[in-house]
Amino acid sequence: MRDALTVFHPMSNPRTASSKLIADADIDSVTALTQAFRATYRRELQQRSDGPSAEACLWAAAHASRELLAERWIRTQAQDRANTTARRVHYLSMEFLMGRALGNAVAALGLEDELRAALEAAGQSLPDVLEREADAALGNGGLGRLAACFLDSFATLGLPSFGYGVRYQYGMFAQQIAGGRQGETPDDWLKRGNPWEIHRPELHYFVSFGGRVE
């Protein structure tokens, strides 16, 4: 039996910024991003003694962007439910190679300049923070890239859709060169956590496998 996870990827952790900062409809997106970023960043710094870091800024920026995306997602779901003729696409795939999420999320929100300014105020640059994010190792082949392209197309066309897959801990191999030879080691992409996930322990699903082991 597996717990459910919701992943916002253009869309838990105690470092999540307060969603109340985003819920107020009178706050525009620019102000919301800045306030949510600062709130999460302060929570990060409470756990640190060495000052600002790209890692802390990554978590702050990801959570701030996720909250804004979540508000859009909630409104979209409400509109779809109100439209009784709307159908949904449920896309199942063993792999999803979505790439790094923060850059896509900020671009979708149209807030790159605002995030860049917030990071510079914290002594960090946007390229350095984006580089800190690990690629989501949820597969290693063309099937995963194709699935990601389908989801991007659904979003571009405005089609109500969800992607369902497997949350691999070691979905890829990390390549290393030692003694002039190439070697592979498991890519533990979750070792620092994933700011885009929302753990949902109240939901459980039985996963069955056919066949037998000899």
Predicted regions and their residues:
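A conserved ligand/cofactor-binding region detector
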Residues: 5-214
